[in-house]
Amino acid sequence: MSTGTVVQVIGAVVDVEFPHDAVPQIYDALEIKSEGLVLEVQQQLGGGVVRTIAMGTSDGLRRGLEVVNSGSPISVPVGSATLGRIMNVLGDPIDECGEIGEQERYVIHREAPSYEDQSSSTELLETGIKVIDLVCPFAKGGKVGLFGGAGVGKTVNMMELINNIAKAHSGLSVFAGVGERTREGNDFYYEMKDSGVLDKVAMVYGQMNEPPGNRLRVALTGLTMAEKFRDEGKDVLFFVDNIYRYTLAGTEVSALLGRMPSAVGYQPTLAEEMGVLQERITSTKTGSITSVQAVYVPADDLTDPSPATTFAHLDATVVLSRNIASMGIYPAVDPLDSTSRQLDPLVVGQEHYDVASGVQTVLQRYKELKDIIAILGMDELSDEDKTTVARARKIEKYLSQPFFVAEVFTGSPGKYVSLKDTIRGFKGILEGEFDHLPEQAFYMVGSIDEAVEKANKK
């Protein structure tokens, strides 16, 4: 327990001088007791001085304050005591419900599991959302990215996934709110409470108003809690909203530490920082971590270095499209842009694969015909193309679905659709079973039987 003094404060960066024989190691947690502030060592500058990032606001700090070295990295509570609680980056409760009362604490900087410990089995995870289960199925223990610009529904989709999977699979979830709105964190808490799944979710928040050091580490705090559940042999869902803010916090920290920026102003260590987080999100032979990460796409540009770096680590990508959202189709998932490593006949079965490919083929053909329709009208198309267009429009409408978490907005009850019903419905549309039904009957329904019922009512 060596002590040092603050020698320089530049925003969130604090330089601390220690005796030459007691210099803290990289990632050691230091504490300014008088301010109740934790610092994390990022660089050793020489001469006994270390450069640190503050985990809270540095307002009111001054030179000469005493700093104590804890001798180890930041540690957070883990285990069942964290369920139903909201914590900050340091694992302190922020829900006004008293102490966590944990039995054990883990440090947030840990090694990823070794290759021989990792699990290689493939098992599908049913989500109850038609478009996802059909076109970009999730693997249990896989990594999923929800890509989308501002306001296309990343957070709502994520909340629906938590709701469906927590109810259908009764697994444990860890939710890391990284640099998002405090209001969304509040909504999420009450949504989980009302759904009755709060006792299965641990929440860690480092919101928009927090300093960059806090936002950079909060994802690791959540992941550490998820790893503990996995090591106990449980299947865990790890949700991160939003992974882009994690990158952005890294950019801010990098600039404050004086590193030279790389492409588009991002930190030069972007790929490495992303890898450190993503490599730890993996399943072992004892338990699984299935992760769903919302990825904000700046200016709807998927080639931006941040989303592009994230792509490399994912098993499935769910791309949310502004064009589809503008048509009033929610979830606004683009079935042509979204991909999954699991969409393979050897994994999902031949029927599922054929139906998914058929849906994509019909939608792609409709996309190609749109220009002709816009210029010449529908009458100029061949009979075969007219049928394709009619079916594609039905498929587009049928890809929409009322969500449980959006009932207050849509006014219609949420629907969970099993994979079997999803395949049956789309197969029927492709084979022309429902050519006689109006396309509006397919909009915002659950199973295909509801669409038929809706059409018959009219």
Swiss-Prot record:
Q: What is its EC number?
A: 7.1.2.2
Q: Name one GO cellular component term.
A: proton-transporting ATP synthase complex
Pfam families attached to this UniProt entry: ATP-synt_ab, ATP-synt_ab_N, ATP-synt_VA_C
The positions annotated for binding ATP are G148, G149, A150, G151, V152, G153, K154, T155
Kindly indicate whether the keyword Magnesium belongs to this entry: no
Q: Which residues cross the membrane?
A: none
Keyword flag Acyltransferase: no
Q: Supply the alphabetized keyword list.
A: ATP synthesis, ATP-binding, Cell inner membrane, Cell membrane, CF(1), Hydrogen ion transport, Ion transport, Membrane, Nucleotide-binding, Translocase, Transport
- InterPro entries of this UniProt entry? AAA+_ATPase, ATP-synt_VA_C, ATP_synth_F1_bsu, ATPase_a/bsu_AS, ATPase_alpha/beta_chains, ATPase_F1/V1/A1_a/bsu_N, ATPase_F1/V1/A1_a/bsu_N_sf, ATPase_F1/V1/A1_a/bsu_nucl-bd
Q: Which reaction does it catalyse?
A: ATP + H2O + 4 H(+)(in) = ADP + phosphate + 5 H(+)(out)
Subunit structure as annotated in this protein's UniProt entry: F-type ATPases have 2 components, CF(1) - the catalytic core - and CF(0) - the membrane proton channel. CF(1) has five subunits: alpha(3), beta(3), gamma(1), delta(1), epsilon(1). CF(0) has three main subunits: a(1), b(2) and c(9-12). The alpha and beta chains form an alternating ring which encloses part of the gamma chain. CF(1) is attached to CF(0) by a central stalk formed by the gamma and epsilon chains, while a peripheral stalk is formed by the delta and b chains.
Q: Which NCBIfam families match?
A: atpD
Q: What's the protein called, per UniProt?
A: ATP synthase subunit beta
Gene of this entry: atpD
